């Protein structure tokens, strides 16, 4: 690898660090993931809390990796899983259909935009995105549009770790090591209108960013462009980025004009986290294909889904079938758990709670931005929220990368009993931000506790890095 590639990837690995207390004896481990750094050993979890082997309780303020939408150890989900385990844990879809998969598909379709009525189950977000790209390509071939193969995406963005998903990911720290092996798909700028200092209105900025799709399509050759993939509300790569309202409708117009399929990556924003079941529902979006995971299984099982319109699926099936599949697609145990998660979202009215508690949490973060002027932006919807650090609020200049503020804030908050999630919003190299995305079951008292810990953590960060504070 080139030195700069090693440096970028090394910084990404540092993002993952959550160190146990150095005084603890650490047992040898044969596991490895992103790095050799060890984590504390969790013993159990319930609600919004996780306990380690020392008995210490921490608040899961990021829902794991924005996964545990309905909280840990929900008894109704566990009971549904146990009931299914007593029947069958694996049924291969080429041999039999199974009722949990059929019912979960029916319930998902009820929550989708009109016309999105075909479901393909997978085990995770990368698989969901991979499936979406492959379905789009097979649709083009089946409808005699084989010249269409390019999938335009945004920079920065993150769509998964498999090679197809990486090809549409715009995050150098993750893509650089694999550059020779991964197709270089076209990119346009993410709609970071909050950074712009121009004479345009906010909505005109949204149109400006959306129009990049038309410009890129024409530059690439419209007949070669297959699809455009985007997160309706950004995830970790952009820190809960929300585009101006004008952006979403214009994107659909451009896709329709040039026959481009619109793929929504709802892996992080879907399953209710933003206060709507889909992030795109805030703008009545009409994508052609949707990728979901994370909150769909809510941490109880590995589960994801690709949902598409019959207009896309039928030509593929008529041309010989979808040349794609996974061993655990439609697994009855996973689908029984996913169905129970949906039922809990409805029973507990968690879409409403995500909206109300999200407003409380967001207002609290905005109040903290008045005290800590190095918070330049607070954004997101529902309980998918982020705060970005800056050196200057007027220019939105980022903090110096060498301060590593995004790493320090995670370490400080964890020491105080709160898990948060951090990255860099501007291509992974600067623009420190932290995400705060607690489970959707959170109460007002728990929101206030989180805000209190964040305030204390920001105080310590300011003192550590000599950042300004308004007393």
Where do the PLM segments sit?
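Short, Lys/Arg-enriched N-terminal segments with co-localized hydrophobic residues
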Residues: 5-17
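Conserved N-terminal phosphate-binding loop of PLP-dependent enzymes in the Aspartate aminotransferase
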Residues: 17-471
């Amino acid at each position: 690898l080139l030195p700069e590639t090693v440096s970028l990837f090394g910084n990404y690995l540092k993002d993952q660090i959550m160190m146990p207390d150095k005084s603890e004896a650490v047992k040898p481990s044969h596991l490895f993931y992103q790095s050799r750094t060890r984590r504390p050993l969790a013993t159990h979890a319930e609600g919004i809390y996780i306990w380690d082997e020392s008995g210490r309780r921490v608040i899961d303020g990021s829902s794991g990796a924005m996964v545990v939408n309905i909280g840990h150890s929900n008894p109704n989900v566990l009971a549904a899983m146990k009931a299914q385990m007593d029947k069958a844990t694996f049924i291969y879809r080429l041999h039999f259909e199974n009722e949990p998969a059929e019912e979960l598909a029916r319930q998902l379709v009820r929550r989708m935009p009109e016309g999105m009525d075909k479901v393909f189950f997978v085990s995770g977000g990368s698989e969901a995105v991979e499936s979406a790209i492959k379905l789009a390509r097979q649709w083009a071939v089946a409808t005699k549009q084989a010249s269409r193969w390019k999938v335009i995406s945004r920079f920065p963005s993150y769509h998964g770790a498999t090679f197809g998903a990486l090809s549409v990911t715009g995050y150098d720290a993750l893509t650089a090591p694999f550059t020779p092996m991964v197709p270089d798909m076209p990119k346009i700028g993410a709609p970071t209108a909050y950074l712009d200092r121009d004479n345009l209105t906010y909505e005109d900025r949204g149109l400006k960013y959306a129009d990049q799709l038309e410009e890129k399509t024409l530059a690439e050759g419209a007949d070669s462009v297959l699809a455009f993939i985007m997160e309706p509300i950004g995830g970790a790569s952009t820190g809960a980025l929300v585009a101006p309202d004008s952006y979403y409708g214009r994107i659909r117009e451009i896709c329709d004009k040039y026959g481009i399929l619109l793929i929504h990556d709802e892996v992080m924003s879907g399953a209710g986290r933003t206060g709507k079941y889909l992030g795109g529902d805030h703008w009545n979006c009409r994508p052609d294909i949707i990728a979901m995971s994370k909150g769909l299984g809510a941490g109880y099982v590995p589960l994801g889904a690709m949902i598409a319109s019959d207009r896309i699926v039928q030509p593929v099936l008529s041309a010989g079938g979808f040349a794609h599949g996974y061993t655990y697609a439609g697994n009855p145990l996973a689908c029984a758990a996913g169905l129970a998660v949906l039922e809990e979202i409805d029973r507990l009215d968690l879409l409403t709670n995500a909206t109300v508690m999200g407003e409380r949490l967001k207002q609290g973060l905005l109040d903290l931005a008045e005290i800590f002027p190095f918070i330049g932006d607070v954004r997101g919807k529902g309980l998918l929220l982020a705060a970005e650090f800056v050196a200057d609020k007027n220019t939105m200049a980022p903090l110096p990368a060498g301060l590593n503020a995004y790493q320090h804030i995670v370490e400080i908050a964890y020491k105080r009993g709160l898990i948060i999630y951090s990255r860099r919003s501007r291509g992974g190299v600067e623009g420190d931000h932290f995400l705060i995305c607690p489970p959707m079951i959170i109460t007002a008292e728990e929101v206030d506790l989180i805000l209190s810990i964040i305030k204390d953590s920001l105080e310590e960060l300011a003192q550590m890095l000599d950042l300004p504070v308004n007393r």
